[in-house]
Every structure is written in structure tokens, then in C-alpha cells.
């Protein structure tokens, strides 16, 4: 089970990266009037769907949940007759260690409550520019930095218990999650065929 989840997480992560890279190529081709806006829209939706699939995979195990880690710390047994005392800043520390920019990873709470919102803001900005026919080079929009800060603040203000995965877990659910990811990777492969460049 753990091996399957690890391979699937890696596959999802690589596919997410591939959709963004492919979209970058398609945006440049669109600027040069060599690609249709629909191609960019499809890649944006595929990227969002892949992130949802990653969330579904992460929800299948407590190993990827900060809420579960905190719960295990709270339930720790005494050691040598000494009851453990949980630092009141433990939850904030868990969040900070996971959310900082240089070591973000596959934590369910981050994927579901930070990455999804950041991804939505990213694609909303790009698709708005495409819909407006803005073919100029795009500077990094200051609005995205403000949105990222608001998303971060909301994440820190929301208790981990409220963000914990609620998915039903079992062999059938894991198989469904893996099949869903496989279908999305198949859709991505169709997008990267040389004939699909335009």
C-alpha cells in the first residue's frame, strides 16, 4: 500500500509539473498565433484535476496528514513514568515546517487547503489574460502575491482538525484513486503528442 502511494504521489507530482511546462509552451505558441486558447484551457483543467487526484491519494493514509501527526503526539504514552507535555505551539510549528517555501511536500492539508487555492489563483490569472487576448509578455502579477499571503494566513488560522482528510480508506478506494490518476496521466500523454503542439 505504501509503495503504491509513493509511486502514485511521484507520478502525480511529475504530471503536475508536466502540465505547467506544457502550458508554458502552449502559451508562447498562442502568443505567436500557433496554438488555440482551448489547448491552454484544457491543460489548466488537467492540472487542477491532477491536483485533486493527488489530494485523493494523500487522503488515503495518515502518513500524509499533519492533523494525524498532531493527534499522535497528543496521544503519546508516558515514557519512563513521565507523561509527555505538548508544547502549545506544536500545531503552528508543524504547519510552519510544512508550508515554508523551501521544503513544501505532500501533506494532505497543504495540498487541499493551500496548493488548490494557489493553483486556482494562478490559472485564473493566466486564463483571464488569454481570454482578453493579451499576447504581451506577462510580468508576475502583484495580485498573486497578495492572494498567496491571504491563502497562507487562512491556512495558519484554520485548525488542523478542521482540515484533516475525511475520505473513506480501503483497498477499493485506493484502487479508484489510482485508476483516476492513471486516466489523467493518459489525458496528459495525449496533450504532449507532437501532433498536439498546435
Q: Positions of the model-derived regions?
A:
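Catalytic domains of carbohydrate-active enzymes that cleave complex glycans
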Residues: 1-198
Amino acid at each position: 500500500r505504501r509503495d503504491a502511494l509513493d509511486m502514485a504521489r511521484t507520478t502525480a507530482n511529475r504530471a503536475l509539473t508536466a502540465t505547467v511546462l506544457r502550458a508554458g509552451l502552449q502559451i508562447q505558441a498562442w502568443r505567436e498565433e500557433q496554438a488555440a486558447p482551448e489547448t491552454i484551457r484544457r491543460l489548466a483543467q488537467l492540472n487542477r484535476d491532477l491536483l485533486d487526484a493527488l489530494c485523493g491519494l494523500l487522503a488515503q493514509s495518515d502518513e500524509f496528514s499533519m492533523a494525524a501527526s498532531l493527534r499522535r503526539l497528543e496521544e503519546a504514552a508516558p515514557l519512563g513514568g513521565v507523561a509527555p507535555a505538548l508544547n502549545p505551539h506544536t500545531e503552528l510549528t508543524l504547519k510552519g515546517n510544512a508550508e515554508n517555501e523551501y521544503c513544501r511536500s505532500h501533506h494532505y492539508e497543504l495540498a487541499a487547503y493551500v496548493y488548490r487555492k494557489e493553483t486556482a489563483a494562478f490559472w485564473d490569472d493566466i486564463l483571464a489574460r488569454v481570454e482578453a487576448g493579451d499576447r504581451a509578455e506577462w510580468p508576475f502579477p502583484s495580485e498573486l502575491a497578495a492572494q498567496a499571503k491571504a491563502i497562507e494566513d487562512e491556512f495558519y488560522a484554520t485548525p488542523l482538525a478542521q482540515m484533516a482528510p475525511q475520505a473513506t480508506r480501503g483497498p477499493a478506494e485506493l484502487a479508484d484513486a489510482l485508476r483516476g490518476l492513471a486516466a489523467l496521466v493518459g489525458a496528459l500523454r495525449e496533450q504532449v503528442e507532437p501532433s498536439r503542439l498546435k
